[in-house]
Amino acid sequence: MSEHKNGHTRRDFLLRTITLAPAMAVGSTAMGALVAPMAAGAAEQSSGSQTARDYQPTWFTAEEFAFITAAVARLIPNDERGPGALEAGVPEFIDRQMNTPYALGSNWYMQGPFNPDLPKELGYQLPLVPQQIYRLGLADADSWSKHQHGKVFAELSGDQQDALLSDFESGKAEFTQLPAKTFFSFLLQNTREGYFTRSDPRWQSGHGGLEADWLPRRTR
């Protein structure tokens, strides 16, 4: 991913909006709600003083968490104006998300048929909930990284990581278990949610943060 987009840094581009990534194409019934039980659940379990270094994941494997940690650091990097996703504790936030009803798709309509070719306005069209998307997507992402560079994503240089993230975003990367775009869209959206939630003073006092259960909404 290039460091600048239309005259703005990557950080500016990612932080100036919290709209959904286009590839997700989900319903907007909850877009106006900024305080949500799911985010509160992930936040209240976390310790505001715990750093990314000493946090031990409870759902992701060590290898998966290394990918998440490296990726969010590239998606929202720190700069002279403030901390990035890593410093804000986004990896911990995403890991804790995986232990909430959101990650199991508890509030989603997940009955078939699923048709990925339908217009995006009709909502998410894969039979996969977030836990599955991350587990399969992380495996495919590291497999693609090894195919391209001989190393897993977390071991690559920053420039190499940026290039691979761009490939995931565009769909150029060839995943075998789900579309690369779908994996990237979830990762990007959850990174944004985690960053804004963890940066919100309400998170520190356990009063919740940003909505994260907006993602897939399918019409029946």
Curated annotation (Swiss-Prot):
The protein's name: Gluconate 2-dehydrogenase subunit 3
InterPro entries: Gluconate_2DH_su3, TAT_signal
Temperature-dependence annotation: Optimum temperature is 30 degrees Celsius.
Entries under Pfam families matching the protein: Gluconate_2-dh3 (PF13618)
Changes after translation: Predicted to be exported by the Tat system. The position of the signal peptide cleavage has been experimentally proven.
Keywords, comma-separated and alphabetical: Cell membrane, Membrane, Oxidoreductase, Signal
Catalyzed reactions: D-gluconate + A = 2-dehydro-D-gluconate + AH2
GO MF assignments: gluconate 2-dehydrogenase (acceptor) activity
Signal peptide annotation: 1-42
GO cellular component: plasma membrane
Record lineage: Bacteria, Pseudomonadati, Pseudomonadota, Gammaproteobacteria, Enterobacterales
pH dependence per the UniProt record: Optimum pH is 5.0.
Membrane topology: Peripheral membrane protein
Location(s) in or outside the cell: Cell membrane
Oligomeric form and interacting partners: Heterotrimer.
UniProt main location, coarse: membrane
